[in-house]
Amino acid sequence: MDTDLYDEFGNYIGPELDSDEDDDELGRETKDLDEMDDDDDDDDIGDHDDDHPGMEVVLHEDKKYYPTAEEVYGPEVETIVQEEDTQPLTEPIIKPVKTKKFTLMEQTLPVTVYEMDFLADLMDNSELIRNVTLCGHLHHGKTCFVDCLIEQTHPEIRKRYDQDLCYTDILFTEQERGVGIKSTPVTVVLPDTKGKSYLFNIMDTPGHVNFSDEVTAGLRISDGVVLFIDAAEGVMLNTERLIKHAVQERLAVTVCINKIDRLILELKLPPTDAYYKLRHIVDEVNGLISMYSTDENLILSPLLGNVCFSSSQYSICFTLGSFAKIYADTFGDINYQEFAKRLWGDIYFNPKTRKFTKKAPTSSSQRSFVEFILEPLYKILAQVVGDVDTSLPRTLDELGIHLTKEELKLNIRPLLRLVCKKFFGEFTGFVDMCVQHIPSPKVGAKPKIEHTYTGGVDSDLGEAMSDCDPDGPLMCHTTKMYSTDDGVQFHAFGRVLSGTIHAGQPVKVLGENYTLEDEEDSQICTVGRLWISVARYHIEVNRVPAGNWVLIEGVDQPIVKTATITEPRGNEEAQIFRPLKFNTTSVIKIAVEPVNPSELPKMLDGLRKVNKSYPSLTTKVEESGEHVILGTGELYLDCVMHDLPKMYSEIDIKVADPVVTFCETVVETSSLKCFAETPNKKNKITMIAEPLEKGLAEDIENEVVQITWNRKKLGEFFQTKYDWDLLAARSIWAFGPDATGPNILVDDTLPSEVDKALLGSVKDSIVQGFQWGTREGPLCDELIRNVKFKILDAVVAQEPLHRGGGQIIPTARRVVYSAFLMATPRLMEPYYFVEVQAPADCVSAVYTVLARRRGHVTQDAPIPGSPLYTIKAFIPAIDSFGFETDLRTHTQGQAFSLSVFHHWQIVPGDPLDKSIVIRPLEPQPAPHLAREFMIKTRRRKGLSEDVSISKFFDDPMLLELAKQDVVLNYPM
C-alpha cells in the first residue's frame, strides 16, 4: 500500500479519482463476479472462501493457526477436551499395575523325596491310595501335624523352629487370624513301617465349629477320618459333633491323641496319671461312638492299631507297633508285633521271669505302657529340657542319636524337636494306622456310593463306581470350589469315582437340582487343566483315574455348591450325588447393600462368588429388595464380609446389624375346622393343624424316617415309635416344605364321606400348596416347624377343568394358613449350645454373663487332669452377639467359649396379642418378646405390621367364625 496516499488514520489524501468511469466499471465487474460466485456456490459451497481469502473479514478468534485434532489423528479417533481437571489429587494420573493376591503359593515346584512321576504312577493303583480327612476340635494340632508330613516329604522346606509353618493355611486371612477357615487338600507319598509307599490324599479341615461345613465337604470325598484330640483338653464340643458326623457319613474312624508333650511339660503329670488320662480319652471316644453307631465292631484301641499318639510340635508320632519296632531295631531278636499287643491295658512286665502278666508282680510295678513307652519318653524330654550340658550327650549316644556341637547349642524347643525327630524317625505309625483301618478307594467305593449316589447301585454305572473302574464311564463328584489367587475364577475340587477325567475333555456338569425328568440344571463344559493339589502348589497332570482327588479348571460356571461331572453322551441314566448334608444350621443373618447404589451389579457378582466359596452359606433377596446372607456364626460371617468387599466385588458395602431366623409353630390343635373354597367355588378343602410329637421333627430332618419309604414301612415306624394309629400312619402324604421338612400332611378323610379317587387326582396340587405354605408362614414369612396338618374333608369338582393346579394350590396354601392361625401360633427362636473353658475362679463370672443374656448353665465340671473347668450352657442366638467379647472382658481373657446351633425353642409370649405396646429403645419384658420379634421382622421384610386374616379366611369361613363366637386378636 502507498503510504503517501493515506494519512496516519487511514484516510485517503491522494489526487482525485475518475469516479464515474471507475464506478461503472467497478459495478460491472462486481456484478459479474457475484453471478460467477452464485454459480460456484451452487456447485460447491465453500469455494468462495478458498478463491478469495483476501476479500473477507476474519475475526481474531476465528483465525486458524493449528490443524484440528481430527485432522491430526483421523476421524476414527474420538478426542475429548476437558477444561477442568476432575481427577482428585489422591488418585495418580498413571495408576500402578494392581495385582490381586489373596493366597500364599509356591512359585516353583519344591523338591520332594520322591519323583513326581512316581506319584503319578501310584494314582493308577487304587489299592495303594488312601483318602483321609484330618478333623478335630479347634487348635488340637491338625495343621501342625500336616506340617510334619510336609517336612518329611519336602526336605528343602525349612522353617524357623520357633514358628509354626502352617503350610495348609494358604489364605492370608488364615495366617493373620491364626485359625483355619478353608479345608485344604494335600497329596503326598508316605512310607509305612515296612518301607512300602502309599499315596495319601489328606484333607486338613478347620477346627472351629462355625466352619464345620468345610469338614462336611472333606468327609464326602474321603474313605475315613483321623480324629485329632488334644491330650490335655480331651474330648471337646467339636470332637463329639465330628464323631457323630463321621458315623452318620459311614466312614472309618481312627484317632490321633496329639500334644502328649503337654501332659509332661505343661501339666507335669506323673507317668501313671498320664496313662489314666490317655485311657480316659479313648474310653470317652468309644462311649460316643457306641451312642451314635449301630456297628458293634467299631471300637477304638491302641491294641487294634487304630489309635496313635503324637506331638506335632516336637515331631513325635507313634503307635504301639511303631514304638515296639524301635525296641526291635535297638535290641534285635524281638517280635515287635507280638510285643506291641502287650503294651496297653492292665498288663505288667516281670523282670525276673521276663514275662508279661495281668497281675502286678509287686506293688510298685508299672503297667507295660508306662514302663516301655511313657517312662522313656519322659526321660528324653526331661534330659533335653533339664540337663543339656552334662548328661545329654551321653544319653543321646546310648540312643544312637548323634548331634553336632552347633545343634547342641540350639534353644530348648528346636533342640527337643530335633532329638525327637531323630529318635522317632518318620511318621510310619500314622501311615500303618491309615493303611490298616481306612479302606482304599476300591474297597470303600461301594458303601460310599450306596450312601451318596441318588441313582441305582445295581446299574452298569453303579457297578463301575462300586468297582472304582478307571476304564468305566466318567463319574466325578465335586464338593468344593477354590478361587484362584486373584479371586476372579474358581476351580472345582472333587473325587473321580469311575472312569478317567482328561484335560480338554468335553463333560456334562449336573447341578444339585438335576433329575432325569428335569434336565434344566445341566450344562456341557470343556475341562481345562487338571491338577493334584498340595496346599501351596499344584502338580499339573493330563488325566486323573478313578479313586483320586482332582482340581478341575473350566467347569466352575454352572456349579454353585456341589456337582456331578459325567460324559456328555452315552451316559443318559447318570443321576446326581446328593447335596451335602451339614451338621449345623445357618441361623444368623445380615443384610448388605453397596454404599454406591450404582455398584449393585458388582455386589451381586460378589455374592455369587462368595456363595460358591462357602459351602453352607445362603444368600437370598427379601420381598423388600434387601439382600440377606445367612451363616453359622459371627466368625463365619466376619470371614464372609472380609472376602465379599475385598476379594470378590472390590466395592464398599454397608452391613446391617446381625439378626436371626425364626420359625413358626403351634402349641394346640385348631379350635375349629378351617375350610377354604377355590376361586371358582367348585372345590372346598377342610383342614386342622396340631403340634407334632416331640422328637419327630428332628427324626425327619436327620433322615431317620424318609417319605420315600413304602407305606407299610412308614406306617410301622410311626406306629411303634410315636404311637400313631396305623390308618393315620399309612395316610401320610408328604413332609414339608421339602422331603426332610419338619411338618407332616396327613389325609384324615374317610372313604364313606370323600371320593378318594377324586381327592387322589388333586393330591399333587394339595401337597404343593402345603409345601408352599410351610415354607413361608403367616406370622412373618418364616419356615413353619413341628406342625401336623390333617385334611378332614374335601369337595372336589368332577370335571378336570375345574380342579386344575391354579385353583387347588393357592386354596390349599390358604387353608394351611387358616388352620395354623386357629391353633394358637407361636414363634420359635434358635438356641446355641455354648461350651466355655475357664479356670475355677472364673466360673462365677461365666454364670453372670450368661444370666444377663437369657442363658442358663446345664453342666459345670472340671476337666480331668487339668486345672480348667468346662461350663456347658444354652443361650438364645439373638442374644449371643458379642457374648464372647463380653465373657473375656469379665474373666480378664481367661475364659474361652465356642457356640453352635443346638435346637429351636418357643419364644415366650403371644405374637398376636395386640394389647402389647412395643416401646422404642426399651428392652422388652419376657412376655412381650414374641410380639416384638414378629413386628420387627415384618417391618424389616417390608410386610404390613400385623397379620391380616382377610387374606387367609374366605367370607364363608369368617361367617362360621362369627357363628361360633370365636374371638380373634387379628386385624381384619
From Swiss-Prot:
The modification N-acetylmethionine is found at M1. Its main location: nucleus. There is a cross-link at K64 (Glycyl lysine isopeptide (Lys-Gly) (interchain with G-Cter in SUMO2)). Belongs to the TRAFAC class translation factor GTPase superfamily. Classic translation factor GTPase family. EF-G/EF-2 subfamily. There is a cross-link at K64 (Glycyl lysine isopeptide (Lys-Gly) (interchain with G-Cter in SUMO1)). Residues 17-26, 34-48 have a biased composition (Acidic residues). The keyword Acetylation applies. It comes from the Eukaryota. This is 116 kDa U5 small nuclear ribonucleoprotein component. GTP binds at residues 136-143, 204-208, 258-261. Residues 1-54 are annotated as: Disordered. Keywords: Acetylation, GTP-binding, Isopeptide bond, mRNA processing, mRNA splicing, Nucleotide-binding, Nucleus, Phosphoprotein, Spliceosome, Ubl conjugation. It holds the Pfam family EFG_C. Required for pre-mRNA splicing as component of the spliceosome, including pre-catalytic, catalytic and post-catalytic spliceosomal complexes. Component of the U5 snRNP and the U4/U6-U5 tri-snRNP complex, a building block of the spliceosome. As a component of the minor spliceosome, involved in the splicing of U12-type introns in pre-mRNAs. The modification Phosphothreonine is found at T86. It comes from Pongo abelii (Sumatran orangutan). Signal peptide: none annotated. GO terms for biological process: mRNA splicing, via spliceosome. The modification Phosphoserine is found at S19.
